[in-house]
């Protein structure tokens, strides 16, 4: 198939090209040309054409405000909520989603429905349920609660057996829970190592909700290589992360979208904390 009369951005030169034809073959770009070749054609009438976007920090099943989450919710309802959001993402141009904790493993169920041809949604790369310590950041959100290295190992293996592509853990607190701080680790080093060992045995990796430097350094020692948020990241830790080639998803919107948070019904303390953390968060990512 050829998509004709498209407008594309040349990311090398920064120039906008009009009247471009793009060949799609087996779901991939086969050729870009001023003149289409033989085959089916679909005119875009001068619309912009971009590759599918990838969202790497997604919670399709999340409930706003977080305090309204029902951990005993019927999984069918959870999947329907996730389905609607996945469709919204697809309409916005997002064709791949990495989920990093879903209530009732809604990501895995939705991905299975898509494979069966029952759901038109982006490609979903799921973590299933995240794993948290007792009293930790994931409590009340449908996470798996584990205490000690063996419990974390078993929890990770259970999520992997369910079909997860990666494992999500909360290694620090965050800004969503009243009275919670994020400057100290919530998981210990042995628990981190046990989780990484379980993931490595399945040829995959661990992604960590990680707000501050001490916990990130412990996680790096254990072999965790994907991090979310980094609200308070010092220069030495940022340098180490870069040198070791790990990945950071900064989620800057978490501390810079107060109007959206109020619209979604977040508690005022969450909005206030978000405002307070924003300058440090922005400075951390700039490092």
Q: What kind of feature is each model-predicted range?
A:
Residues 81-107, 121-130, 164-177, 205, ...:
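Divalent metal-dependent hydrolysis catalytic cores, especially in the metallo-beta-lactamase
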Residues 176-286:
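Active-site core of metal-dependent hydrolases
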Residues 67-80, 137-155, 205-207:
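Active-site mouth loops of central-metabolism enzymes
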Residues 39-48, 107-118, 149-164, 233-247, ...:
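Short amphipathic alpha-helices and their capping/turn segments at secondary-structure boundaries
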Residues 1-2, 8-50:
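Histidine-rich, glycine-flanked metal-binding segment
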Residues 47-118, 135-137, 190, 222:
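Metal-associated gating/positioning segment near the N- to mid-region
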Residues 5, 47, 57-61, 209, ...:
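Histidine-centered divalent metal-coordination motifs
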Residues 135-190:
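Active-site gating/metal-coordination segments in enzymes
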């Amino acid at each position: 198939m050829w998509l004709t009369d498209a407008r594309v951005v040349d990311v090398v030169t920064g120039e906008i090209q009009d009247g471009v034809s793009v060949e799609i073959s087996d779901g991939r770009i086969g050729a870009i040309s001023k003149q289409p070749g033989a085959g089916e054609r679909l005119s875009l009438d001068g619309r912009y054409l971009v590759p599918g976007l990838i969202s790497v920090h997604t919670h399709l099943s999340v409930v706003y405000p977080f305090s309204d989450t029902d951990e005993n919710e019927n999984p069918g309802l959870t999947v329907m909520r996730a389905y609607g959001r996945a469709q919204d993402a697809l309409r916005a141009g997002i064709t791949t989603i990495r989920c990093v904790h879903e209530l009732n493993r809604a990501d895995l169920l939705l991905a299975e429905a898509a494979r069966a041809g029952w759901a038109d949604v982006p490609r979903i790369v799921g973590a299933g349920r995240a794993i948290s310590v007792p009293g930790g950041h994931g409590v009340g959100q449908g996470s798996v609660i584990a205490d000690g290295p063996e419990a974390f190992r078993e929890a990770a293996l259970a999520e992997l057996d369910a079909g997860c592509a990666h494992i999500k853990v909360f290694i620090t607190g965050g800004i969503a829970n009243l009275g919670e701080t994020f400057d100290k680790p919530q998981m210990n080093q042995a628990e981190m190592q046990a989780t990484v060992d379980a993931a490595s045995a399945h040829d995959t990796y661990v992604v960590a909700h990680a707000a501050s430097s001490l916990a990130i350094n412990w996680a790096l020692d254990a072999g965790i290589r994907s991090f979310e948020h980094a609200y308070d990241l010092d220069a030495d830790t940022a340098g180490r992360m870069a040198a070791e080639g790990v990945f950071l998803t900064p989620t800057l919107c978490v501390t810079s979208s107060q109007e959206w948070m109020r619209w979604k019904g977040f508690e005022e303390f969450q909005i206030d904390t978000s405002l307070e953390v924003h300058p440090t968060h922005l400075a951390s990512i700039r490092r």
